[in-house]
């Protein structure tokens, strides 16, 4: 009895589960089916009431199982829509999270094994889908749209979209153009651009709910997990997601913030309205929208489906309205007018700003530099580098485009730069032109400086001895017409004799094979009208006879003008091109009178006051400049032959004496004693070049002869400052000797320019030549040098003939080599002790050889190279050689003259009478001396009057034996 009332208490338990299914409380609905223990409790409670009868309990149990399965199915349908909306919107917009009661942690939605923060924002928009069921209240299709609202734009902002080509399109104008054809457009959608449209739909069921619904629902739930995971992943691959992420990083305009709305898909849309999702916003071949379906998930209530339609291009931006309008105007005439023939300005590179006379002949399609002429006379149009033509062409390859011409400039354009003519034609044009600008002197060069294949000079100026540039080397272009005109530096003759601003120095180098142009100032010296002289003797006559072209030493060029690139030859093509372009160049100069603008020239060139002050200061230095020019002229005349011959010393190290100054190997410009741009070379004799004084005898003979006749012979004891006072006042410097393969037994005297006192003896009456010792030290008493020898020869020429007749046989049997052999074989202690004081002892340079340079080494001498290059001998030298040697052969005369210059000819025998035997009897030498015996026998025959071909052959043999034919193939420098 007690159990029946208790059993009646749980009997209404199956009625509790339907209570949480009320539509007004969602949380209770979700909590009730989530706890299966409630259902089990009800079943157990129902199982306890079996006693009333089997029929009522079976029907109630089946009804309870059906209601439970249906409740779970309804929960799946509800969460199917809400979870899809949560996944889609969480990846597009920022949703505020919802919190549990009494907790600060956000509530997490874990349905379908995808954890997302739950939010209360979607409760109201999704209410119809949260309260739906599978039988009575089926859910309508859920449509979620993401869009951009243009109402947040200001008046000067426009929403634009970039097409596949990068062109901007105004979205509002595109929509307005599309809505113009619509009868009733939705006003709410006028300013909205739909990006995506998601559709979540539950299809109609084909049959009634199955009886085993509870066993089918777990399978439906597992299939939905796969669907929602794919939805979560694919939603982050669409263009709208990339657009939203970019906006979050850049924090762009509020108009670019993605918005959303939830729409009932069952509401029919008016066909006349414009769909802002499929409306094309730009012209192009790309597809406007695309559709993706996630498949169908079968359920007892019907098929579940998720589908998305999205814009393929979501590259939206907010631009300024005026900028967008300006860009349209700039490209408005692209397709309006297109000429049938191409314009000439298309292929014309680097237009130059400025006006040009209409009659100027335009060059049709010039190349990158318009270079003409040979490598020696290189002219170009464009930026100049001052280097070789190859380097200039290489640098012009990367030249950038010039400044665009203004709108008011004529269509006819200038070439990239002016063509600067070269040669005499350019000089005539500079003198005859009526331009206010000073003409730059033209430059040409002597052909084939040694070596003929010269390397290109460096781009940079030489770092040694350079004076700073005081004036700019180029005239600025693009200036206005009301600019100041630079005043001429001097009076009427300013075009021919400009005043010097800064003199540049040329640096000599024995290693460099090509001259590098030294920087030249804007204004040259007022003495630049004087003719310059190259130091080479062979080029002097050519310089004197050249009428049209100035030599390289007397010419000036602007730094970086491209004219001093290669000091080789003057090409006939460049001269012809200069003559053809003179008229055009003068017209261009007349039209460019407005180049000297104060705005640009002030930063480049000094003002007129500074220029005038500098010119006035340098005008006062004309006297010192004249004295300097005269001093340089004398010193260069003295060293012309020695300097010119030094360029043949290719195997000599850089600092070896005799190669200190060279015109062809200087890195700077060629030197001249008459131009202020050449350095002042002091008259310092080097050791190698002091052996040859061909030019000293040639140029200073008339100035020395009166002094020699009036001075007594005892004055020869004076130094070189007394004898050579008119020529030079500089002393000699001790330059290190050249490298040699044998250790020298004696040190060579450094009496190159300083004249040592001449020690006279009794033999001077017979041998008037002061013999110079080549083996004495610098501090020891040396014999008279070659200058003193020549002076004694000049003063005692009349008394010399009898002495030469007496000394003929002695000289024929003696000589420098004979003396050296005798000294090596017979020198004893006293003889060695007196060797330094004996003025007639000729000691060899090497103790065990015939001397330095006799196997071809003498060709390095500046005297022999000067003769080989064609240095002319004066007639009185040839006559003196014939009187002394008694032969008229050209070979003997040349060799005798060379011996006189070397100080090695007609050496006395120091009082000892030696027989004419072969010198091999005295001491075994390093080289065979048979050649010298034959030459001495021929010389003996020549002394007795044989002046025929035999003497000529013997003289040639003697010269070859003394000049290095003794042992072929041996060279002391090798």
From Swiss-Prot:
Stored Pfam families: ATG13
Low complexity bias (residue ranges): 451-464, 491-521, 790-800, 848-873, 887-896
Compartments where located: Cytoplasm; Preautophagosomal structure
Biological process, per Gene Ontology: mitophagy; piecemeal microautophagy of the nucleus; protein localization to phagophore assembly site; protein transport
Polar residues bias: start-end ranges: 1-10, 32-45, 379-391, 434-445, 469-482, 547-559, 720-730, 823-840, 906-916
Residue ranges of the region described as Disordered: 1-61, 379-575, 661-689, 703-743, 787-974
The family this protein is said to belong to: Belongs to the ATG13 family. Fungi subfamily.
Protein name per Swiss-Prot or TrEMBL: Autophagy-related protein 13
Species, as recorded: Penicillium rubens (strain ATCC 28089 / DSM 1075 / NRRL 1951 / Wisconsin 54-1255)
């Amino acid at each position: 009895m007690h159990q029946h009332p208790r059993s009646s208490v749980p009997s209404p338990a199956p009625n509790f589960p339907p209570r949480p299914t009320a539509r007004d409380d969602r949380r209770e609905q979700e909590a009730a089916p989530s706890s299966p223990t409630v259902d089990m409790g009800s079943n157990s409670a129902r199982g306890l009431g079996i006693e009333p009868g089997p029929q009522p309990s079976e029907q109630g149990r089946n009804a309870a199982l059906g209601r439970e399965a249906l409740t779970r199915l309804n929960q799946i349908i509800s969460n199917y829509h809400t979870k899809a909306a949560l996944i889609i919107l969480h990846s597009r917009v920022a949703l505020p999270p919802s919190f549990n009661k009494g907790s600060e942690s956000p509530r997490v939605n874990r349905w379908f094994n995808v954890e997302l923060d739950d939010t209360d924002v979607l409760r109201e928009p999704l209410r119809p889908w949260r309260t739906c069921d599978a039988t009575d209240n089926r859910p309508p299709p859920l449509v979620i749209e993401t869009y951009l609202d243009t109402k947040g734009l200001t008046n000067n902002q426009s929403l634009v979209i970039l097409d596949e080509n990068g062109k901007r399109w105004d979205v509002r104008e595109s929509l307005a153009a599309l809505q113009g054809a619509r009868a009733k457009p939705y006003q709410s959608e006028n300013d909205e651009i739909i990006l995506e449209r998601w559709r979540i739909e539950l299809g109609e069921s084909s049959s009634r709910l199955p009886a085993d619904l509870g066993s089918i629902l777990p399978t439906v739930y597992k299939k939905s997990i796969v669907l929602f995971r794919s939805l979560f992943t694919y939603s982050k691959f669409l263009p709208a997601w990339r657009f939203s992420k970019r906006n979050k990083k850049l924090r762009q305009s509020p108009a670019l913030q993605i918005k959303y709305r939830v729409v009932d898909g069952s509401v029919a849309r008016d066909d006349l309205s414009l769909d802002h999702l499929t409306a094309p916003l730009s012209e192009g071949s790309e597809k406007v929208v695309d559709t993706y379906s996630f498949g169908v998930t079968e359920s007892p209530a019907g098929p579940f489906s998720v589908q998305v339609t999205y814009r393929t291009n979501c590259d939206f931006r907010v631009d300024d309205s005026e900028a967008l309008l300006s860009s349209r105007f700039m490209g408005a005439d692209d397709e309006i007018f297109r000429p049938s023939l191409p314009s000439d300005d298309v292929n014309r590179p680097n237009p130059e700003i400025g006006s040009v006379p209409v009659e100027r002949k335009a060059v049709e399609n010039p190349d990158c530099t318009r270079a003409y002429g040979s490598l020696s006379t290189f002219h170009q149009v464009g930026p100049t580098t001052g280097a070789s033509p190859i380097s200039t062409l290489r640098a012009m390859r990367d030249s950038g485009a010039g400044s665009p011409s203004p709108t008011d400039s004529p269509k006819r354009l200038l070439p990239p730069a002016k063509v600067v003519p070269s040669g005499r034609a350019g000089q005539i044009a500079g003198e005859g032109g009526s331009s206010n600008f000073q003409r730059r002197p033209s430059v040409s060069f002597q052909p084939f400086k040694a070596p003929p294949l010269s390397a290109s000079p460096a781009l940079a100026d030489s770092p040694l001895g350079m004076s700073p540039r005081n004036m700019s080397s180029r005239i600025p272009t693009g200036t206005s017409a009301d600019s100041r005109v630079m005043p001429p530096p001097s009076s009427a003759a300013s075009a021919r004799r400009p005043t010097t601003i800064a003199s540049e120095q040329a640096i000599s180098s024995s290693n460099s094979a090509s001259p590098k142009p030294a920087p030249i100032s804007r204004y040259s010296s007022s003495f630049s009208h004087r003719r310059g002289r190259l130091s080479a003797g062979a080029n002097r006559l050519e310089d004197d006879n050249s009428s049209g072209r100035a030599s390289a030493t007397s010419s000036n060029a602007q730094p970086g003008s491209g004219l001093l690139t290669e000091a080789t030859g003057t090409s006939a093509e460049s001269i012809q091109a200069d003559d053809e372009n003179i008229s055009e160049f003068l017209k261009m100069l007349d039209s460019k009178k407005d180049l000297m603008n104060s705005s640009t020239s002030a930063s480049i060139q000094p003002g007129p006051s500074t220029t005038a002050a500098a010119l006035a200061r340098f005008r006062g230095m004309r006297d010192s400049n004249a004295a300097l020019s005269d001093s340089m002229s004398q010193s260069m005349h003295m060293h012309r032959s020695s300097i010119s011959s030094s360029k043949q010393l290719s195997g000599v190290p850089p600092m070896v004496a005799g190669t200190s100054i060279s015109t062809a190997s200087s890195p700077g410009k060629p030197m001249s004693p008459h131009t202020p741009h050449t350095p002042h070379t002091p008259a310092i004799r080097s050791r190698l070049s002091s052996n040859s004084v061909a030019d000293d005898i040639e140029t200073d003979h008339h100035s020395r002869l009166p002094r020699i006749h009036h001075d007594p012979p005892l004055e020869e004891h004076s130094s070189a400052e007394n004898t050579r006072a008119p020529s030079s006042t500089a002393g000699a410097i001790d330059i290190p000797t050249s490298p040699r393969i044998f250790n020298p037994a004696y040190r060579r005297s450094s009496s190159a320019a300083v004249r040592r006192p001449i020690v006279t003896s009794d033999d001077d009456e017979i041998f008037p030549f002061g013999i110079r010792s080549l083996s004495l030290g610098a501090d020891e008493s040396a014999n008279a040098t070659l200058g003193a020898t020549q002076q004694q020869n000049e003063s005692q020429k009349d008394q010399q003939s009898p002495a030469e007749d007496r000394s003929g046989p002695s000289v024929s049997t003696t000589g420098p080599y004979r003396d050296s052999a005798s000294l090596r074989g017979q020198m004893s202690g006293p003889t060695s002790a007196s060797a330094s004081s004996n003025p007639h002892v000729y000691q060899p340079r090497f103790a065990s050889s015939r001397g330095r340079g006799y196997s071809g080494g003498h060709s390095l001498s500046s005297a022999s190279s000067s003769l080989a290059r064609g240095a002319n001998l004066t007639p009185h030298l040839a006559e003196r050689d014939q009187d002394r040697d008694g032969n008229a052969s050209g070979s003997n005369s040349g060799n005798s003259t060379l011996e006189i210059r070397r100080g090695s000819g007609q050496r006395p025998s120091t009082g000892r009478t030696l027989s004419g035997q072969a010198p091999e009897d005295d001491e075994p030498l390093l080289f065979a001396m048979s050649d010298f015996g034959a030459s001495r026998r021929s010389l003996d025959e020549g002394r007795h009057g044989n002046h025929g071909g035999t003497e000529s052959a013997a003289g040639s043999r003697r010269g070859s034996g003394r000049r290095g034919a003794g042992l072929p193939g041996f060279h002391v420098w090798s």
